[in-house]
Amino acid sequence: MEERRPGMGVIVPAGEAGRTTVEGYDPKLHDPYFDGVSQRLADKGFVTAAADDLITWARTGSLMWMTFGLACCAVEMMQASMPRYDLERYGFAPRASPRQSDVMIVAGTLVNKMAPALRKVYDQMPEPRYVISMGSCANGGGYYYFSYSTVRGCDRVVPVDVYVPGCPPTAEALVYGVLQLQKKIRRTGTIVR
């Protein structure tokens, strides 16, 4: 069997047949024209970046959240906004309207009667939109799991991006969840093609 050397062509999966790539090659990083232009602009004090990278960077630093506080987890969410933890220093500011927010924090027990309202508010949010499920009740029903009226996790109603465990989770856990969401946005981007 032939050993692989750097620079050998690698066959792309059948869905993209006919194209080959070279290991370690990234067109953004290795385009000679882009490198030349980038170097000339850097000498003049400018920074070059792809537009989608710039938009993703800006979006992670200006996430607007709205609360869907249903129970005691909302108290910890309020504490995370106070001066000790101050979520706004991460660019995570509260908004009252779903039409102005990017992130919904579902905190507390979601019951069957409230599920349609949650979905309606989620549908009013502009794209791209993200959901943080905060606490055991929002994650999977929690203490009220066996109740006839409890939805066993808000992910049955809306798609969830980050789960914050705990009963109730601490403000530090929510801050960590926000940082994880920002990492996810940086990793996946926001532009759909």
Curated annotation (Swiss-Prot):
InterPro entries: NADH_UbQ_OxRdtase-like_20kDa (IPR006137), NADH_UQ_OxRdtase_20Kd_su (IPR006138). Keywords: 4Fe-4S, Cell inner membrane, Cell membrane, Iron, Iron-sulfur, Membrane, Metal-binding, NAD, Quinone, Translocase, Transport, Ubiquinone. It is found in: Cell inner membrane. Disulfide bonds: none annotated. One of its GO terms (cellular component) is plasma membrane. It catalyses: a quinone + NADH + 5 H(+)(in) = a quinol + NAD(+) + 4 H(+)(out). Pfam families: Oxidored_q6. PANTHER family: NADH DEHYDROGENASE, NADH DEHYDROGENASE [UBIQUINONE] IRON-SULFUR PROTEIN 7, MITOCHONDRIAL. Belongs to the complex I 20 kDa subunit family. This is NADH-quinone oxidoreductase subunit B.
